[in-house]
Design a protein with these regions (language model features):
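Flexible loop/hinge segments that line or gate small-molecule binding clefts
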Residues: 132-177, 182, 194-195, 256, ...
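N-terminal helix-turn-helix DNA-binding module of bacterial transcription factors
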Residues: 1-70
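Short beta-strand segments enriched in small/hydrophobic residues
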Residues: 26-30, 64-80, 185-193
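Amphipathic helical "hinge" segments at domain boundaries
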Residues: 56-128
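Periplasmic-binding protein-like
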Residues: 126-132, 188-191, 223, 244-254, ...
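Hinge/beta->alpha junction and helix N-cap segments in small-molecule ligand-binding domains
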Residues: 76-86, 104-113, 164-174, 190-238, ...
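Flexible loop/turn connectors
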Residues: 243-249, 254-337
Length: 337
């Protein structure tokens, strides 16, 4: 059997080699690989030839033939996040079931790296992009509008773009409204940059409005900013407790920052105090296991990954009855309030 030698010196099996060994035409091998009709006898011979030779179909050749690489670019803000891991699990479930693979890019919460990866993916062989979005700047909007492959956003509602998101304002309003009736004393708030429309701006505004609906004001002097991390929540809470030792409760924009605030309260007021004095967002499983559950908001992160990926692939695959790229708002659930 004839084998070609690649530039790396490794023997490369070609389709014609499989055909020669199986005693069939190259066209028959191609039909077998693409699920076309072929007799049982020929199919078995081709299967055995592939197993004997270790033949692997070239993804580049498939892309040239079909116009599809079966690759989806996925851009996430960080990989050490429970919410992101749930989202990517949902994405992976759908991609695997429908014959696609994932190329994962981690931005470390850097908005400029989101733009770099958007440019990289659309100029390299991916069929579409899923962006787990954080900050949406004018540059982001231009990049999304001009993207040459279909793109779906998760986590932000951007006008004119395909999005799967949760209503952060509504969820935060409900949380603030519920907490106002059970917290005696001053309430502080640790948020994130409001350049992040969903987690920063909408959650703070919604929480403040929820308190205000029952006559409780959020003192601007008791608002601090963190950076999504446990350490930033801890540092902000320690600073709040030093300048306002009579603070009764600290609401946080994420469960991770709430874990840091909980630790700070335990250090200042005694072990076990923190779990009764903080709230978060995200329903973190690890924090729930440690505390029994703090007041928080549960989002269907896995569902958002599933829905966004199905939306994208239905468009790419031309699934009948699907309306293509659109905006989808998912529900939420208050926990432990």
């Amino acid at each position: 059997m004839v084998k070609a030698i690649s530039t790396t010196g490794v023997l490369v099996v070609k389709m014609k080699d499989v055909a020669e060994l199986a005693g069939v035409s190259s066209a028959a091998v191609s039909r077998y690989l693409n699920g076309g009709y072929i007799s049982t006898d020929k199919a078995e011979r081709i299967k055995q030839a592939i197993e004997l030779t270790g033949y692997v179909r070239s993804s580049q050749a498939r892309a040239l033939r079909t116009g599809s690489t079966k690759l989806i670019g996925v851009i996430v803000p960080k990989i050490n996040s429970e919410s992101v891991s749930r989202i990517t699990a949902g994405i992976g479930q759908v991609l695997g079931r429908r014959g696609y693979q994932m190329l994962l890019a981690n931005t470390d919460n850097a908005a400029d790296r989101e733009l770099e990866y958007l440019d990289l993916f659309q100029n390299h062989p991916v069929d579409g992009i899923v962006l787990v979005a954080t900050m949406i700047t004018d540059e982001h909007r231009r990049a999304i509008e001009s993207c040459r492959v279909p793109i779906v956003l998760i986590g932000q509602n951007v006008e004119g773009a395909a999005c799967v998101y949760h209503d952060d304002y509504e969820a935060a309003f409900e949380l603030g409204h519920a907490l106002a009736g059970r917290v005696d004393g001053k309430i502080a708030y640790i948020g994130v940059t409001e350049e992040d429309r969903a987690a920063g701006y909408d959650r703070r505004r919604g929480f403040e409005a929820g308190l205000g609906a029952v006559g409780v004001a959020l003192d601007p002097s008791l608002i601090r900013l963190g950076s999504f991390t446990l350490d930033s929540g801890y540092g902000a809470a320690r600073e709040l407790l030093s300048v306002a030792p009579d603070v009764s409760f600290i609401a946080c924009a994420t469960d991770t920052m709430a874990a840091g605030a909980l630790r700070a309260i335990d250090e200042v007021r005694g072990v076990g105090e923190g779990m009764h004095r903080v709230s978060g967002f995200g329903d973190n499983a690890f924090l729930r296991a440690l505390t029994g559950g703090i007041p928080t908001v549960h989002y269907g992160y896995l569902t958002s990954g599933v829905e966004a990926t199905n939306m994208l692939l239905n468009t790419l695959d031309g699934v009948e009855g699907e309306s293509g790229l659109k905006t989808l708002k998912l529900g939420h659930q208050l926990m432990n309030v």
